[in-house]
Each structure stands twice: as C-alpha cells, then as structure tokens.
Amino acid sequence: MRRGRNSLLDGRMVSAPPDRIAFDRGVLTRVREADVADFIGAAAANAERLREWIPWGDDPAYRRERIGGAPVDWEQHRAYLYALRESDDGAVIGGFSLHRRVGPDGLEIGYWLDAAHTGAGLATEAVGVLTAVALALPEVERVEIHTDEGNTRSAAVPRRLGYRLARVDAFEVRTGSETGRLQIWVTP
C-alpha cells in the first residue's frame, strides 16, 4: 500500500489515501480517467437496485457527471473514489469512496456493491479496510457512514464494524425508497 501525498486544502495540510488498497478478497483502486467507462458500466448494470438509495443510481447523465469528475475530485482532495475488483485486472464489482464533507477532521465513506456480490460480507470487509486507511491519515480523527434508516442492509455494515449510531437527522428524500431519516454512524 503506497502512501498518498500531502497537499493544502482550504489552508490546511491534508493527506491523500493510497491509490491501491489490497485485502483478502479484493483490491480497491483509484478511479482514473481510463477507469471511468468501466465504473459507469458497472453502476449502470446495477442501476435498478441502486436507484432505491443513491440519487445518481438511475440517472445516466448525473452518473456520468459524478463518476466522470472523480479524477479531478481526487486531485483537489474533495473525494477519493475507488473501484472494487476481485483482482487488479478484474471487472468493477463495486464502488467505495472517501468524502471530505463531514468537517476538517473527518471523512465519510460511501459504498455500493454489484448485486451478484452482496450477502457474503465483502462490503463489510472493504469498508473495514477503508476505515483503517482513513484513520491512518494524520488529519483524520473520525470516519462517518451515512445510511437511510430504511436501508437496513447498508446500515448493517457500520454496525458490524463497531461504528456507533451518533444521531438520526432529517433530510430531503431524493429516491423512492428513502425515508427522510439519515443515520449518522461514527467510528468509536
């Protein structure tokens, strides 16, 4: 695992996570320009399922904008998008990300997994590894995961990893399955 580099963001020094993170059942690799089409294809193949919980899940233009902007977001230290693959040259089977939108000392993890790979603990394993990587960055004191109260499968991931439910906030519903109650899970 190669350490990321340091940069200034909003007048403070921040560290980028590594471009590649290998673990027992997969590898998380930074989404670069060359990866965008494969990532979009994997997300599109899961659009029907993702649209229940992710606003860009069923909107091809929004999906292209969000995923297509990932390389720039990484360079500007706004967010770090990873493709999950079973091997370095394997197909994209999920998306995992770190976002700098929860305050200067925290990162938020987001994730989705291809339907054929759910139910076997792979998301939990990948999020666990990504949590450790995030907490190893010198400026990061906490990691958050935000899940809709109705998305029990997604909420099971932070629960299994020992995150604590810090609060439940109201939010504007953007998809058909959302409840408008956002669970904020925080590392202990």
Q: Can you describe what each PLM-predicted range is?
A:
Residues 31, 42, 62-63, 76:
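Generic, well-ordered alpha-helical segments
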Residues 69-83:
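A short helix-loop-beta-strand connector motif used in the catalytic cores of GNAT acetyltransferases and
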Residues 40-43, 67-71:
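A generic alpha-helix structural signal
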Residues 48-69:
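Conserved GNAT-fold acetyl-CoA-binding loop/helix
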Residues 1-38, 42-52, 81-188:
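Acyl-donor (CoA/ACP) binding surface of acyl/acetyltransferases
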